[in-house]
């Protein structure tokens, strides 16, 4: 008798996605991050749901409602810090997942990659709006600075900003709509992640060698389910360690001060996972130019498949491209550091050079190096 999982309409979908899915036999731990991102999303939705039960999206009570969650709600402090640090874990997994895609040429699956870029934008938008909700100093001023960037759009800019604010400044209307969007976006992200998987399963997974693995496939369960569970356990260990030992390590002390429109903090900066983009934004003295550079710093990922000039898919056997890849990683770490520094002498020029190098590596140096490597192999 055929298994129920192969005949039942719902079980059939689960079976073909997570049980009998033919998977390359040689995918490494770098392929674990997809499932880890799924776990992160579930954790964020669940903790967010419980936080929303106690949070009030009103400028007068938002800050005190977060304080109430931490002090009076049963395990409220745990839920709040799991949610805040869960976002950091989410972005760590995201960056590693994208890095894996770049290194092993997974971007050649065009639909999967483009939906991934869309997901990255959606997660960044969600995280930004979530950072505004506690209504601390950095929440308020971060919202003011980032939404104000839209005023750089010619002709409609200032109207657009006031439309987003729901008034003439960041106020009650802004907070309420940010809460509404912050609540709904994770469900849109979950739906997009489903489409992401749908397109991935059309082609099957890539593997470290970048070669076709059609001749050597194994079922996803039990091999990769066990492997994914190990990854999940390590993620939970890292997250709980962070939450229970140093929950404020990645936060900003300014956000423990209630929002005050009359007092600007000395250094306005976003959460650590946006610092690289923030550094690119600040490296251009012109407002519109900075906004375009900020958007392009993420959108450039969508161009990468069209700049693939190598005859090989993966970087596994391309040492020169590997060198450039790790220079790109170092450059992003440099940008992250610069984004958290004040705008003064050594940091300005370092940020500008790192920003130029970022675009130069992706758009020019990597494609040229790939062509050079083709010639080395007489292809």
Curated annotation (Swiss-Prot):
GO BP term, pick one: mitochondrial electron transport, ubiquinol to cytochrome c
Keywords annotated in UniProt: Electron transport, Heme, Iron, Membrane, Metal-binding, Mitochondrion, Mitochondrion inner membrane, Respiratory chain, Transmembrane, Transmembrane helix, Transport, Ubiquinone
Required cofactor(s): heme b
Transmembrane stretches, start-end: 33-53, 77-98, 113-133, 178-198, 226-246, 288-308, 320-340, 347-367
Claim: Transcription is one of the keywords in the record: no
Keyword Heme: yes
Pfam families, per database record: Cytochrom_B_C, Cytochrome_B
MF (Gene Ontology): metal ion binding; ubiquinol-cytochrome-c reductase activity
Other observations noted: Heme 1 (or BL or b562) is low-potential and absorbs at about 562 nm, and heme 2 (or BH or b566) is high-potential and absorbs at about 566 nm.
Complex formation: The cytochrome bc1 complex contains 11 subunits: 3 respiratory subunits (MT-CYB, CYC1 and UQCRFS1), 2 core proteins (UQCRC1 and UQCRC2) and 6 low-molecular weight proteins (UQCRH/QCR6, UQCRB/QCR7, UQCRQ/QCR8, UQCR10/QCR9, UQCR11/QCR10 and a cleavage product of UQCRFS1). This cytochrome bc1 complex then forms a dimer.
Family the entry assigns: Belongs to the cytochrome b family.
UniProt protein name: Cytochrome b
Gene name of the record: MT-CYB
